[in-house]
C-alpha cells in the first residue's frame, strides 16, 4: 500500500545515510 511504499523509501534513505556517515 501507499504507507508501505513510504516506509520502504524511508528505509532506503536511512540505509543510504548510514553508508554515507560511515565514510
UniProtKB/Swiss-Prot annotation:
The keyword Hydrolase does not apply. One of its GO terms (molecular function) is oxygen carrier activity. It comes from the Eukaryota. Hemolymph. Its main location: secreted. Keywords: Copper, Oxygen transport, Secreted, Transport. Signal peptide: none annotated. One of its GO terms (cellular component) is extracellular region. Hemocyanins are copper-containing oxygen carriers occurring freely dissolved in the hemolymph of many mollusks and arthropods. Belongs to the tyrosinase family. Hemocyanin subfamily. This is Hemocyanin subunit 4.
